[in-house]
């Protein structure tokens, strides 16, 4: 009995073979849900595999994906299969895992299934699929139209047939944590241009997969277009209409300002905030310092550990079984304490912060750049940011509160090594180039640049990708993508524990940073290991932060590229000139530049907030 509800590949295959399609869909959703919980890991899904694969983890994953893709093909190719309106929403929430099953198998995509839905035998182009007029066919098409699909899709036609189904597909196609290949990347780029004005027409979130709203909100930052964040504005409008019509939401009357211990109150809504997380390391010191002027109340999830809770005068778990209840709880805390400031150190990684950003909870509402991008919210007035991280203020809908560059001093990672034995190779036969990157930061433009570095360098180079989030069924797909550009000149290391990740980078001679979405922690890790590298700067904070950090660390400005051509040229120079590279590394090691990131005056944020509050009180 214990194993009956455990995800099991054989149970899924048996239900498909028996044409028990309701059970087959339930079994499939159970497997997809487990993949989602495990970030793509297959270790809690039961399936038998040949003993020969016992110690071959990647081959075992490809075997799993191939078996799953084969059974899904049989299931979805049968015209008898019907998926309900509710069913399609459940499948689209998990579409990214369906996509990875096919992408990490020899199938690559599910176009061979979509071809079975074609009803026009005399079509001129095999990539044109002519569906019958039933909603059932459109539903199945949407579930299996994946990021790697080569089939043509006219979004305008689909919108005219079913706006909510079209919007749901657009949500699903923006949800993967890896959209790196040119096919997938261009698909998302097209959606980011087309979708905002259409999304804004929806009355509410009722018939779209709102559980992945935060992926739509956050993943747009990894695109390259100037207006890539416009989708947030449309999503914010729909969320606002939804909470007003479905929740009966009323904003807090912010005329009353309360005081605790003779201080105005700042309510802080947290996402990921524990001592091991980067948001804690980058934003805790400034909040502790703000307690000089404000009484700080922290609101967060059970993942906020003791160190995270101790940042605040008091801390509460956000109560509520659903979003309506959570928002009402946050409002009640703000109301009962007469909050003067509502502050979120980060926004975009959790649904609660995004929904809260579309409400009025305090007279002054601000975010910091834990996820470095604008909110495009009508309810957020200010963004806290260090002055040297700003590329262009035009990237923001908010007013920037630009603090001195040492006003948000970092807390060193608890996992950072106490001692590093630096590996300084005088004249390596192969220059090992490290890349610290999550899967989300990989894209075709970055890989083309790496390919150009390899081709132009007069020395042999080898790229080591120390990848975050490349787990389970994600990794074979990511590895194939990297190899498609760099072949044997690259090693794609799957997601690994921090010390193992550092060991990969430790064995490198230099690093290069991803673009357009750069690194913060990756640069700290680089300098910790006595390495130097190249970055590309730009207008967005998530591009410009690399430049700011390089300058703070005392690295020469030639390592900061303004264009892709400069990036390639500087990386080639660093790879070819061993003596110059070693001198830079020794300079970094001897000057301990990291101390500049861990020291500073964290008081300006509290002072600036107090100035804004006093100005508000004077006017009101």
Curated annotation (Swiss-Prot):
Record-level GO cellular component terms: cytoplasm
Pfam family, one: HMw1_D2
Main enzyme class: transferase
GO molecular function terms attached to this record: glycosyltransferase activity
Catalytic activity, reaction form: L-asparaginyl-[protein] + UDP-alpha-D-glucose = N(4)-(beta-D-glucosyl)-L-asparaginyl-[protein] + UDP + H(+)
Keyword Cytoplasm included in the entry's annotation: yes
Keywords: Cytoplasm, Glycosyltransferase, Transferase
Subcellular location: Cytoplasm
Protein's job: Inverting glycosyltransferase that catalyzes the transfer of one glucose moiety from UDP-glucose to an asparagine residue in peptides and proteins containing the NX(S/T) motif, resulting in their modification with a beta-linked 1,N-glucose. Likely acts as a key component of a general protein glycosylation system.
Designated name of the protein: UDP-glucose:protein N-beta-glucosyltransferase
């Amino acid at each position: 009995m214990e194993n009956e509800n455990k995800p099991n590949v054989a149970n899924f295959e048996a239900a498909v073979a028996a044409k028990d399609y309701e059970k087959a869909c339930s079994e499939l959703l159970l497997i997809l849900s487990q993949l989602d919980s495990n970030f793509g890991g297959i270790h809690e899904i039961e399936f038998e595999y040949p003993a020969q694969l016992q110690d071959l983890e990647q081959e075992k994953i490809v075997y799993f994906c191939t078996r799953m893709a084969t059974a899904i093909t049989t299931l979805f190719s049968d015209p008898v299969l019907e998926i309900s309106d509710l069913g399609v929403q459940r499948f689209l929430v998990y579409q990214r895992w369906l996509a990875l099953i096919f992408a990490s198998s020899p199938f690559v995509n599910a176009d061979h299934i979509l071809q079975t839905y074609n009803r026009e035998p005399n079509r001129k182009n095999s990539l044109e699929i002519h569906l019958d007029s039933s909603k059932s066919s459109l539903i199945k098409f949407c579930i299996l139209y994946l990021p790697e699909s080569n089939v043509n899709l006219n979004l305008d036609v689909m919108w005219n047939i079913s706006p909510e189904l079209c919007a749901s597909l657009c949500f699903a196609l923006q949800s993967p944590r890896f959209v790196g290949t040119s096919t997938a990347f261009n698909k998302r780029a097209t959606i980011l241009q087309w979708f905002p004005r259409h999304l804004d027409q929806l009355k509410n979130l009722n018939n779209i997969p709102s559980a992945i709203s935060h992926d739509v909100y956050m993943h747009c930052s990894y695109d390259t277009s100037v207006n890539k964040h416009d989708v947030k504005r449309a999503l914010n409008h729909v969320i606002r209409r939804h909470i007003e019509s479905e929740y009966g939401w009323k904003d807090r009357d912010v005329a009353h300002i309360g005081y605790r211990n003779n201080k105005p109150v700042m309510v802080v809504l947290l996402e990921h905030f524990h001592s091991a997380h980067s948001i804690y390391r980058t934003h805790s010191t400034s909040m502790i310092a703000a307690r000089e002027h404000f009484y700080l109340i922290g609101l967060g999830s059970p993942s906020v550990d003791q160190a995270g809770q101790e940042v605040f005068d008091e801390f509460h778990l956000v109560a509520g079984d659903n979003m309506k209840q959570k928002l009402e709880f946050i409002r009640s805390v703000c109301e009962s304490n007469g909050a003067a400031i509502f502050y979120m150190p980060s926004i975009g990684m959790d649904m609660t912060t995004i929904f809260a950003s579309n409400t009025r909870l305090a007279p002054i509402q601000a975010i910091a750049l834990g996820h470095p991008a604008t909110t495009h919210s009508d309810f957020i007035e200010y963004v806290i940011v260090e002055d040297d991280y700003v590329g262009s203020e035009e990237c923001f809908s908010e007013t920037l509160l630009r603090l001195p560059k040492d006003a948000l001093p970092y807390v060193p990672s608890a996992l950072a090594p106490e001692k590093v034995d630096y590996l300084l190779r005088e004249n390596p036969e192969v220059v090992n180039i490290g890349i610290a990157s999550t899967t989300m930061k990989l894209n075709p433009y970055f890989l083309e640049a790496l390919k150009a570095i390899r081709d132009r360098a007069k020395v042999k180079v080898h790229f080591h990708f120390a990848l975050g989030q490349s787990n389970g069924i994600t990794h074979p797909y990511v590895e194939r993508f990297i190899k498609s550009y760099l072949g044997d000149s690259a090693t794609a290391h799957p997601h690994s524990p921090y010390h193992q990740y550092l060991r990969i980078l430790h064995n490198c001679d230099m690093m290069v940073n991803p673009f357009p979405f750069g690194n913060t922690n990756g640069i700290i890790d680089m300098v910790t290991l006595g390495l130097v590298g190249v970055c590309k700067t730009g207008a967005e904070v998530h591009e410009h932060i690399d430049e700011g950090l390089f300058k703070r660390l005392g690295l020469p400005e030639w390592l900061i590229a303004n264009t892709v051509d400069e990036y390639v040229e500087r990386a080639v120079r660093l790879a070819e000139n061993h003596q110059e590279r070693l001198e830079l590394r020794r300079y970094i090691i001897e000057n301990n530049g990291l101390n500049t990131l861990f020291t500073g005056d964290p008081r300006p944020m509290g002072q600036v907030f107090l100035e804004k509050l006093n100005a508000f009180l004077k006017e009101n």
